[in-house]
Amino acid sequence: MRDEIKTSDANLEIDWRSICPISSALDVIGDKWSILIVRDLIIHGPRTYSQFLESPEGISTNILATRLELLTNLKLIERINPDKSSRNNAYQLTPAGAALRPVLENLGKWAALHLSEFHSNILKM
């Protein structure tokens, strides 16, 4: 089940694995980078492209650009430009993106509770 999402440069395709809502959510935010972009916006608020690159996980520029475009076109994040200079473009969560906050908080709590035996340095929530 493939759907096209219109973008400014080209069309991105999402290959939906099934009609299951959980599977569909994972098709969008289930990859490492998309969920970490959302995490950074939840924790820090609006972020610039270069601030995302400073993340300790070390996202590459091409992956970051692709994920920002995908999340923007899916209306989970939006680009803001306070002074109309392209150098100062930033991204912030939309209401749909902000609705992921309790999901990520619960995922973090679950990981802290159930993975600490295997990951001795995991942060406690």
Predicted regions and their residues:
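N-terminal leader segment of winged-helix/HTH proteins
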Residues: 1-29
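Canonical helix-turn-helix DNA-binding module
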Residues: 53-86
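Basic, amphipathic "hinge/linker" alpha-helix immediately C-terminal to the N-terminal HTH DNA-binding motif
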Residues: 30, 83-107
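Short histidine
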Residues: 6-16, 33-38, 48-49, 102
